[in-house]
Regions:
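Short amphipathic alpha-helices in soluble, non-transmembrane regions
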Residues: 1, 111-118, 220-224, 321-323
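Charged, long alpha-helical assembly modules
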Residues: 79-95, 122, 320-322, 327-337
């Protein structure tokens, strides 16, 4: 592959080593600062194809692969380079190219020539889909580190359970994050924060942020269905939940953000009609609609996918929660929580 006469298939081994070290450093910093995101990614990768792809390209699995490449670069560099070339040749082809471009009319005037130039630089290739399948194994891992706090994620899916998606699930996120989870995890439990979501795909998660607890947090997640069955809120609180949900759904976006949202909608098949239906369900949500979500939450929890990142002593003290425990950095798995 050449661009402006420059051969792009030549790999400088010294520069490649530098890039791998940079990637390892940035990935490690991301895991340290966003342990809640990493824990959710890992737990949902057990059962979700999309999350599995995200995990092997940006999550803990990705970091540990890069870490191994750096550690074994001298003996494995030929294999690494061959693999990178194989991936580049399979993905970066004319037939596989999709372009998302956001600009005003003047900006669009540059697009045809730029795309022609880029297209000519790419090999024609074969339009091929590469299936990525989640392992379907509930590993339930604990990743240990020197951290004093924990990130505890409980994930699952209600897809295939017969329950339809509803916009009220967005309102549930607001209600949980500012009521049940906030009171039990933040106020009573001492966690710095808590997050949750159940998405249109059926995947859902509950996760704590900088949490001193482990098993106690998972027990709180288990109590969500009962909380919903007895859910009550007056008109003022329901209005507050609706406003909070709509403000998140209809947040003003920059042109770049609009382009990214549009591309995501295009890939997922999300239409304006589907978004409006979701908006209407939020605006018309009643207490009874929130109570009716207890079944969906039970299905999510029934999946039983769990991942925790944090303090080694705490994770080992609650080892019965996990199917495997391993160091987050430079480690190999220890099965059955040993």
């Amino acid at each position: 592959m050449t661009v402006d006469g420059t051969e792009l298939t030549k790999l400088d081994e010294k520069r490649l080593r530098e890039i791998l070290n940079e990637v390892r450093s940035k990935s490690q910093m991301r895991l340290m600062s966003s342990g809640h995101t990493a824990a959710v990614s890992r737990a949902t990768s057990y059962f979700s194809d999309v999350s599995y792809y995200n995990e092997i390209t940006a999550g803990i699995d990705y970091f540990q692969s890069v870490e191994q490449w750096v550690r074994e670069f001298d003996s494995k560099k030929g294999e690494i380079i061959a693999g990178l070339k194989r991936v580049m040749g399979a993905l970066f082809t004319r037939d596989n190219m999709t372009v998302s471009y956001t600009a005003d009319d003047q900006g669009f005037s540059f697009l045809p020539e730029a795309m022609k130039k880029l297209s000519q630089a790419l090999p024609e290739g074969e339009k091929k889909t590469y299936a990525v399948k989640a392992p379907g194994i509930r590993r339930n891992e604990g990743f240990t580190s020197s951290s004093k706090v924990n990130y505890v994620a409980r994930c699952g899916s209600f897809a295939g359970s017969g329950y339809p998606y509803t916009g009220v699930l967005r309102l549930l996120k607001v209600a949980l994050n500012y009521d049940y989870l906030w009171i039990n995890l933040r106020v009573k439990g001492g966690a710095y924060g808590c997050m949750s979501a159940i998405t249109r795909s059926g995947d859902g998660y509950f996760v704590s942020y900088r949490d001193p607890n482990m098993k106690e947090t998972n027990d709180i997640y288990e109590g969500i269905p009962e909380y919903l069955e007895n859910f009550n809120a007056d008109e003022r609180d329901m209005t507050k939940y609706v406003i909070g949900t709509i403000s998140e759904l209809d947040t003003p976006l920059t042109p770049s953000q609009k382009g990214a949202r549009g591309l995501a909608a295009w890939y997922s098949g999300l239409t304006d009609e589907m978004v409006q239906k979701e908006r209407d369900e939020i605006l018309n949500a009643r207490v009874e609609d929130v109570r009716a979500l207890s079944g969906i939450v039970r299905e999510v929890l029934k999946t039983g996918a769990l991942c925790a990142i944090g303090n080694e002593e705490k994770i080992k003290a609650d080892a019965a929660m996990f199917g495997a425990i391993q160091p987050l950095y430079n480690g190999t798995a220890s099965e059955d929580g040993q």
